[in-house]
């Protein structure tokens, strides 16, 4: 706690525990005592959309099998109640109307249920037009079967067309770096669109998670900007973008960098973009731990020229970092104070905090 004599105990966000958000954007938080049963099933559509494909296929296959079995039982019960099971269907009594021809066992009833749902015509087994119960049951099965097929088809289309799938083509650098831009330290990361189709209206936001006051998580917004673009949105995302956060005294990261062993924190980065073809918004997430922030490094160049003068993106250099050249020392001014910054056990460097930011 800031400005307090109480010792902060923070056992949750430590490096021996898993990160809250994985590098590919999935949450690792587990909900104890969350709602279950009917309250959980109210969002059945959302549950299906979040399922993995193998479980979704299993659920849909089981739905069809259960549908066929339920109506097989109903057709069998109808045949038994009508007295059709023990009859010779080729020579029935003159005063007896067979509801469904040749249903003499449960296997035959299941076969008829399957045939009713999946075909447009009947073979040797067919319902009699003189049996109202058979016609009513046939109509009910067809209606429920069409509803089930429509629901499953819609779920497949919705899952395939989700914007989430487009987000998988957005790639963040595995590491972030702290480098000097115009003599001022900046936290930098890169993001790339690995598909040739562009994204528009790109927005980046970040949240710094720290544990304070005996296990309570504290969230702080961290602002990033893109080169010299004054707008919060990048209108066109086709080549790798580099985002910067200026480490000035008001930055939530400035105080964290003053420790030889910085307290554990997690910086979660969110990128939202709009698909040009559909207008749908997709989001990609990643996170950076203190061990994934490289001090006095910069990213390798990604752009090159081809033989015809066209731009080429060297994705093999995407995660490569190189040590930056040390900037000459700046004379102290009355408005600057010295502090030592240590990250991940790297070399100890002397910086000065001024009104314009950290300078070496």
Curated annotation (Swiss-Prot):
The record marks 149 as: Role in the control of polyamine-mediated channel gating and in the blocking by intracellular magnesium. Residues 1-50, 158-360 are cytoplasmic. Residues 78-105, 123-131 are extracellular. Keywords: Cell membrane, Ion channel, Ion transport, Membrane, Phosphoprotein, Potassium, Potassium transport, Transmembrane, Transmembrane helix, Transport, Voltage-gated channel. GO terms for biological process: potassium ion import across plasma membrane; regulation of monoatomic ion transmembrane transport. The modification Phosphoserine is found at residue 287. It is a multi-pass membrane protein. One of its GO terms (cellular component) is plasma membrane. The chain crosses the membrane at residues 51-77, 132-157. It is found in: Membrane; Cell membrane. The keyword Cell membrane applies. Inhibited by Ba(2+) and Cs(+), although sensitivity to those inhibitors is much lower than in other Kir channels. GO terms for molecular function: inward rectifier potassium channel activity. The keyword Membrane applies. It catalyses: K(+)(in) = K(+)(out). Residues 106-122 dip into the membrane without crossing it. Its main location: membrane. Phosphorylation at Ser-287 by PKA increases them. Belongs to the inward rectifier-type potassium channel (TC 1.A.2.1) family. Homotetramer. Interacts with RAB28; the interaction may facilitate cone outer segments phagocytosis. Inward rectifier potassium channels are characterized by a greater tendency to allow potassium to flow into the cell rather than out of it. Their voltage dependence is regulated by the concentration of extracellular potassium; as external potassium is raised, the voltage range of the channel opening shifts to more positive voltages. The inward rectification is mainly due to the blockage of outward current by internal magnesium. This is Inward rectifier potassium channel 13. It comes from Bos taurus. The gene is KCNJ13.
């Amino acid at each position: 706690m800031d400005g307090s004599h109480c010792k902060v105990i923070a056992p949750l966000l430590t490096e021996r525990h898993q990160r809250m958000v994985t590098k590919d954007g999935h949450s690792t938080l587990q909900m104890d005592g969350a709602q279950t049963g009917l309250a959980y099933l109210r969002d059945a559509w959302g549950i299906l959309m979040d399922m993995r494909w193998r479980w979704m296929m299993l659920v849909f296959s089981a739905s069809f099998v259960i549908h066929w079995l339920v109506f097989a039982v109903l057709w069998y019960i109808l045949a038994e109640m009508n007295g059709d099971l023990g009859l010779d269907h080729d020579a029935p009594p003159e005063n007896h109307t067979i509801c469904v021809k040749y249903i003499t066992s449960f296997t035959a009833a299941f076969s008829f249920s399957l045939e009713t749902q999946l075909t447009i015509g009947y073979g040797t087994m067919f319902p009699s037009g003189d049996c109202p119960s058979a016609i009513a049951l046939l109509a009910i099965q067809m209606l429920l079967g069409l509803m089930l097929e429509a629901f499953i088809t819609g779920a497949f289309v919705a899952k395939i067309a989700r914007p989430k799938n487009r987000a998988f083509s957005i790639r963040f650098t595995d590491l972030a770096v702290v480098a000097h831009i115009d003599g001022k330290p900046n936290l930098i990361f890169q993001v790339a669109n690995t598909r040739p189709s562009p994204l528009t209206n790109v927005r980046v936001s970040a949240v710094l998670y720290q544990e304070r006051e005996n296990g309570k998580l504290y969230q702080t917004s961290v602002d990033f900007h893109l080169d010299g673009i004054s707008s919060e949105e990048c209108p066109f995302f086709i080549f790798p973008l580099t985002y910067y956060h200026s480490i000035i005294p008001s930055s939530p990261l400035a105080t964290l960098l003053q420790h030889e062993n910085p307290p554990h924190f997690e910086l979660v980065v969110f990128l939202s973009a709009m698909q040009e073809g559909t207008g749908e918004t997709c989001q990609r997430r990643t996170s950076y731990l203190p061990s994934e922030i490289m001090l006095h490094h910069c990213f390798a160049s990604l752009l090159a020229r081809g033989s015809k003068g066209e731009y080429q993106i060297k994705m093999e250099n995407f995660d490569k970092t190189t040590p930056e050249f040390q900037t000459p020392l700046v004379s102290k001014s009355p408005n600057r104070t010295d502090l030592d910054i240590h990250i991940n056990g790297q070399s100890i460097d002397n910086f000065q905090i001024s009104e314009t930011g950290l300078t070496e």
